Amino acid sequence: LPERFDHDQRPAHATERASGITSNRRQTMQNRRSALSRVLTTAACAALVLATGSALAADHYPSKPIRLVVPYPAGGGTDIIARLMGTQLSQRWGQPVIVDNKPGASGMMGNDLVAKAPADGYTVLLGITALVQIPALYKKVPYQLSDLAPVSQAAKSADLVFVPRSSGITSLQQFVAKAKAQPGKLNYGSYGNATSSHLHGEQLKLKAGIDMVHVPYQGSGPEMAAMLGGQLESAFIDAAAAYPHIKSDKVSILAVTGSQRHPALPDVPTMAEAGYSGFEANGWFGYFVPASTPQPIVDKLGNELAAIVRMPEISKRLLDMGLIPVGSTPAEFKPLLARDAAHWKSIVDAAKISMD
């Protein structure tokens, strides 16, 4: 067996060799620490430069016109909100805000345009709930939700459950009982395939165990006209579009979707209050920018848009449209998107709805 030495019993040449090895190791460790220190210092400097650059960019933002993309036709609710708030933003910042309507493919064309735009805060999207519903409904979407950064939720909306006044039905429970007694005989209208109203109708069918025929329309206007004309036995209609007709003697409103009663209809119960939970998700209108837009610019834009929503005259205009003003920060808006995406996907999957 090799002889074992204590440190003070080693031959001189062994001690010298060990000392040299220790010295080399110490020098190597010092070199590594020095290299690591240089890397960390460089990274810190780069981060500081980046943060400083972003802050300076925000200080000078906006320095040119802002393009506000609306992925739906002119004249609709989204377009009206864009022009209403865009005018105020232009006045407050002294830069033109140009509303650019880019309809097509259920909003995907406009959404994709902004997702792929330069991330400098000068191309902004006013999207709606469909933005988080589309990935669950279509297999091929040209962008990811992660390609867009939330800026501010301007307002939220709800669908109202209508029936003809002549039906004599005064509660959702009565309507469900009638639908169960006549499976497949009653219909419900929506303002389009794969819209929130369509998904709400399918959700009620699943929750209540009823069978109804879906009748889609090209928008809330034609759907409301069909309801008033007695062509539908029931309908989920957007509160903003239905607002001028909520006092009509031709229709009854049984319930409202969303987490709370509508301010204009304090006596109408929510779906949960009417006996059917799971309809708490509201529709919404919200602003987005490309995902890599510097956070100081996102925050500056979000704060300004939220301040505009809080202006009394703007809040009143939104309420008069049947909407509920919100004016959220980017941090408040982001978790809502994740919750809504999961919520709508669960309904689409359960109802086996596909637009492909």
Question: Language-model segments: what does each one mean?
Answer:
Residues 1-63, 355-356:
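Short, low-complexity disordered leader/linker segments with a strong preference
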Residues 116-122, 136-222, 271, 284-317:
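Hinge/capping helix and adjacent helix->loop/strand transition within the periplasmic-binding protein
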Residues 130-139, 205-207, 234-268:
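A ligand-binding cleft/hinge motif common to bilobed small-molecule-binding domains
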